UniProtKB/Swiss-Prot annotation:
Protein name listed in UniProt: Serine/threonine transporter SstT
Transmembrane intervals: 11-31, 43-63, 82-102, 141-161, 192-212, 216-236, 290-310, 316-336, 363-383
High-level lineage: Bacteria, Pseudomonadati, Pseudomonadota, Gammaproteobacteria, Alteromonadales
Coiled coil: none
Cross-referenced InterPro entries: Na-dicarboxylate_symporter, Na:dicarbo_symporter_sf, Ser_Thr_transp_SstT
Length: 408
C-alpha cells in the first residue's frame, strides 16, 4: 500500500512536460496500431478540454475581481506596456506573414465553399461584436465563455469591492485560491487528456488530407516559428535587456505545448495562470493580462489571415503592391484582435481581408474551406503561438518594471 501511494506521489510531483511527451508518443503509437481503439480514447481528450473550458470563465472572473478588490493603493499593474506589446506583436506577425508570402508565393486548389457560415461584413461589424460582448449579461458571459464580458464585469466588481471590509476581500481571496487549486488538479491530468487528443487526431485525420497543402503549411508554420523564435525574443530583449530565450523556451514548452493540443486559447487560460504563478509574476497584473491576451493578442491569427488572403490573391493572379500589402498587415492585425469575437475565429475573417483585393465572397469562402482542411495543424500552431506569447509579454513587462523600480 505504501509503495502504491509512493508511486502516486511520484506521478503527481513528476515533470509534467515529460509526462505530456509520454502521452503524445503513446497516442501516436495507439493510432498507428489501431484506429478503432484510438477513437475509443478520444473522450479522454474531450473531457480534459471540457474541464479546462469549464473552470476558465469562473477562474478569470473571481481572480480579476479578487486581485482588484485586494489591490493595495499605488500598486503598479503594468497593463499599458503589456497591451502595447500585444498590439506590436500582432502587427509584427502580420508583417512577417506578408514578407514570407511575397518571398514564397503560394497558389491554392480551391475547394467548395463552407456552408452555414456568415463572415463579418467589415471592420465595423467586428468592433460592434466586441462592444456588445463587453456589455453582455454577466451570467451569460460566464456560461458562454465570453472573456471580454467576464473581464468587464470582473473589473467592475473588483472596483466596487475595493472599499469593502477586509473580511469581504478575504472571502474573495480564499475563493480565488480554492479555484486555483482546482486548476492545478486539472492541469495534472494533461498527459491523459493529450494522449486522447493525439490518438483521436491521428486516427480521424492523419496527414494524408493535408499533404497537398505542403507549401501553404510551410509558409504558415515558417512565419509562426519566425515570430516565436526570432521576433518575440527580440521584443523581450529590448524590454528586459538580457538573454530572452530561457523565458521564451519555457513559455513555449509549458504553455505552447498544451495549447497546441487543446487548440483553445480559452482552455489554456488556467495553464497560463499557473505558469505566471510559477514565474512569480504580480497576480494583479497576470489576472487581467492573461484573459485579455486570449482576446486581443492574436499574432497567430494575423499570420493565418494574411497568408491565406495573399495565397488567394496569387491564385487569381492579382498583383499586390507594397502599399496594399502594408494595408493588409494593418487590417489583419486589427481583425485578428477581434478574432475571439467571431464564431470560427481567424478563418472567418479571411473574407474581410480578401475584400481589400476585390476578391468575391464566394472565392473567399473557398479559401476558408482550405483553412478548415489544414486546420488540424494551422489551428494548433496558431493557438500555441497566441497563448504562449501572452505569458512571454506579461513576464517581460513585469521584469522590465521591476528593473526600472530598482534603478529608480
Amino acid at each position: 500500500m505504501k509503495q502504491e501511494s509512493s508511486f502516486l506521489a511520484k506521478l503527481a510531483n513528476g515533470s509534467l512536460v515529460l509526462q505530456i511527451l509520454v502521452g503524445i508518443i503513446a497516442g501516436v503509437a495507439l493510432a498507428s496500431f489501431s484506429h478503432e481503439w484510438a477513437k475509443q480514447v478520444a473522450f479522454l481528450g474531450s473531457l480534459f478540454v471540457g474541464a479546462l473550458k469549464a473552470i476558465a470563465p469562473i477562474l478569470v472572473f473571481i481572480l480579476v475581481a479578487s486581485s482588484i478588490a485586494n489591490q493595495k493603493k499605488n500598486t503598479q499593474t503594468n497593463m499599458r506596456p503589456i497591451v502595447v506589446l500585444y498590439l506590436l506583436g500582432t502587427f509584427a506577425a502580420a508583417l512577417t506573414a506578408v514578407i514570407l508570402s511575397m518571398m514564397f508565393p503560394t497558389t491554392l486548389v480551391l475547394a467548395a465553399g463552407v456552408e452555414g457560415t456568415s463572415p463579418p461584413q467589415g471592420i465595423s461589424e467586428v468592433i460592434s461584436t466586441l462592444l456588445f460582448k463587453l456589455v453582455d449579461n454577466p451570467v451569460n458571459a460566464l456560461m458562454t465563455g465570453n472573456y471580454i464580458g467576464i473581464l468587464a464585469w470582473g473589473v467592475g466588481l473588483g472596483l466596487a469591492l475595493h472599499h469593502s471590509s477586509d473580511s469581504t476581500k478575504q472571502v474573495f481571496a480564499d475563493v480565488s485560491h480554492g479555484i486555483s487549486q482546482m486548476v492545478h488538479f486539472i492541469i495534472r491530468l494533461a498527459p491523459i487528456g493529450i494522449f486522447g487528443l493525439v490518438a483521436a487526431t491521428f486516427a480521424e485525420t492523419g496527414f494524408a488530407a493535408i499533404a497537398g497543402y505542403a507549401q501553404l503549411l510551410a509558409v504558415l508554420l515558417g512565419a509562426m516559428a519566425f515570430i516565436a523564435l526570432i521576433i518575440n525574443p527580440l521584443i523581450v530583449y529590448v524590454k528586459i535587456k538580457r538573454n530572452p530565450y530561457p523565458l521564451v523556451i519555457r513559455c513555449l514548452r509549458e504553455s505552447g505545448m498544451t495549447a497546441f493540443f487543446t487548440r483553445s486559447s480559452a482552455a489554456n487560460i488556467p495553464v497560463n495562470m499557473a505558469l505566471c504563478e510559477k514565474l512569480k509574476l504580480h497576480e494583479d497584473t497576470y489576472a487581467v493580462s492573461i484573459p485579455l491576451g486570449a482576446t486581443i493578442n492574436m499574432g497567430g491569427a494575423a499570420i493565418t489571415i494574411t497568408v491565406l488572403t495573399l495565397a488567394a490573391a496569387h491564385t487569381l493572379g492579382i498583383q499586390v503592391d507594397l502599399l496594399t500589402a502594408l494595408l493588409l498587415s494593418v487590417v489583419a492585425a486589427i481583425s485578428a484582435c477581434g478574432a475571439s469575437g467571431v464564431a470560427g475565429g481567424s478563418l472567418l475573417l479571411i473574407p474581410l481581408a480578401c475584400s481589400l483585393f476585390g476578391i468575391s465572397n464566394d472565392v473567399a469562402m473557398q479559401v476558408v474551406a482550405v483553412g478548415f482542411i489544414i486546420g488540424v495543424i494551422q489551428d494548433a500552431a496558431e493557438t500555441a503561438l497566441n497563448s504562449s506569447t501572452d505569458v512571454i509579454f506579461t513576464a517581460a513587462a513585469c521584469e522590465a518594471a521591476e528593473n526600472k523600480a530598482k534603478l529608480g
